[in-house]
Amino acid sequence: MRIFLTAVFALLFIVPNIQAGKVQIPEDTEVKVKFDPGMKISSKLLQPGIPLLIYLAEPVEIGGKVIIEEGAMGKAEVLEVKGASKPGKPGYLKVAFVDIKPKGEYNTLDSAAIKLKGEVESEGGGKKLLSWLFIFGLFIKGGEATLPSDAIYTVQIGETVRLSND
């Protein structure tokens, strides 16, 4: 009788937890993100601290179940920018991926965004040799740094996060 009561008591706590649909995404899980395709990301146009809109490029799945749907919106931030300058110095751009807001059936327990970690950088083409070959080359600027907005970038989840479909 005692074993039966223990089993019934255990089931009372296990069954609601299974039905609740709680999942955990471990830190360093790779996810794929992309920028808004209409956005021009260039060292000529941006300044440090400016937020950029990103989207989840592929759904996050655990055990064959979609936890975060494709298209979930998030944020990246411009960390460093150096515009192209004379004589022939290239531009530089560094962007950090900040977070992504869950989309779909599951949400974080406190409805917070999921932290991301990862950075991408770009350097424009230099024209220094050309600038020294000709006297007028001193007036030639280097190329601006750009990031393709149609590319897919692999980043990681910044910390272990628990989600629920309650």
Describe the residue ranges of each PLM region.
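Contiguous beta-sheet cores, especially beta-hairpins with glycine/small-residue-rich turns
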Residues: 21-166
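Bacterial N-terminal signal peptides
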Residues: 6-16
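Bacterial N-terminal signal peptides that target proteins for export
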Residues: 1-5
